[in-house]
């Protein structure tokens, strides 16, 4: 399984909901605000907003919070003016890390992100230093334990007809890759067949991975945790290849 989707699944399982929910709702609200500001407040006409609202609902964010965030984005309600910014750098072992942030103070966020990199044996780089190693794609994974009696050939045909670019299967999971434009159509095709999806995001997929082990791997995971935990950081992507068992415990 791709490192990022595996990381996301494990992070979801390990999260202590009561502690994380407030921070998660804040990040989901930011995405809705920026999406509505960028493309208008109607999810039917704004793909990015539609995806943000769906993700918020999947995480049990109250409808009142969602509506309030949309109105802040369209200007109906007063709110912060968030700016989108990306940061790039390297973690221990030469792992490439790319992250998206939304902030009302770029200088503060840059300083704090740099500090997190430095204290975890990484370094924040210049714009473009690792972006070329990633492609923005739709990524859907299916946990085979949750999808018993699945016919993989039929599934491959279904996703190909819906526009999927790639279909990979191993002992534990199925991974489907799409363009960002075809992601929603492929996801809906699977959901219409009631296929349980363990991960479904438009994400950044690395073109190659870096194997890290032992203490170095633990340092990479610690860096990932701290970056993801920062209030202004929305998404963190990396090209590490770390053993599943270490990610489960690390």
From Swiss-Prot:
Protein localization: Cytoplasm
InterPro entries named among the record's database cross-references: Integrase-like_N (IPR017856), TACO1_YebC-like_2nd/3rd_dom (IPR048300), TACO1_YebC_N (IPR049083), Transcrip_reg_TACO1-like (IPR002876), Transcrip_reg_TACO1-like_dom3 (IPR026564), YebC-like (IPR029072)
Keywords linked to the UniProt accession: Cytoplasm, DNA-binding, Transcription, Transcription regulation
Entry GO MF terms: DNA binding
Source taxon at top rank: Bacteria
Primary localization class, coarse: cytoplasm
GO cellular component: cytosol
Biological process (GO), any one: regulation of DNA-templated transcription
UniProt similarity note: Belongs to the TACO1 family.
Protein name in UniProt: Probable transcriptional regulatory protein Nther_1800
């Amino acid at each position: 399984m791709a490192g990022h989707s595996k990381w996301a699944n494990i992070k979801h399982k390990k999260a202590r909901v009561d502690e994380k929910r407030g921070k998660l709702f804040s990040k989901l609200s930011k995405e809705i605000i920026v999406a509505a500001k960028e493309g208008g407040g109607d999810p039917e006409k704004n793909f990015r907003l539609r995806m943000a609202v769906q993700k918020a609902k999947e995480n049990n964010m109250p409808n009142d919070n969602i509506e309030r965030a949309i109105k802040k984005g369209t200007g109906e309600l007063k709110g912060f003016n968030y700016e989108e910014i990306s940061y790039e750098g390297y973690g221990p072992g030469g792992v490439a890390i790319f992250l998206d942030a939304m902030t009302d103070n770029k200088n503060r966020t840059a300083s704090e992100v740099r500090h997190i990199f430095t204290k975890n044996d990484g370094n924040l780089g210049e714009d473009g230093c690792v972006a070329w190693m990633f492609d923005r794609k739709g990524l859907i994974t299916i946990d085979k334990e949750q999808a018993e009696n699945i016919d993989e050939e039929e599934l491959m045909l279904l996703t190909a007809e819906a526009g999927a670019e790639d279909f990979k299967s191993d002992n534990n999971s199925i991974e489907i890759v799409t363009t960002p434009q075809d992601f929603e159509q492929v996801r809906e095709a699977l959901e219409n067949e009631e296929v349980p999806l363990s991960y479904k995001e438009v994400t950044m997929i690395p073109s190659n991975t870096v194997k890290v082990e032992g203490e170095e791997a633990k340092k990479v995971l610690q860096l990932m945790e701290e970056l993801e935990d920062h209030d202004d950081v929305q998404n963190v992507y990396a090209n590490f290849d770390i053993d599943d068992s270490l990610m489960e415990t690390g």
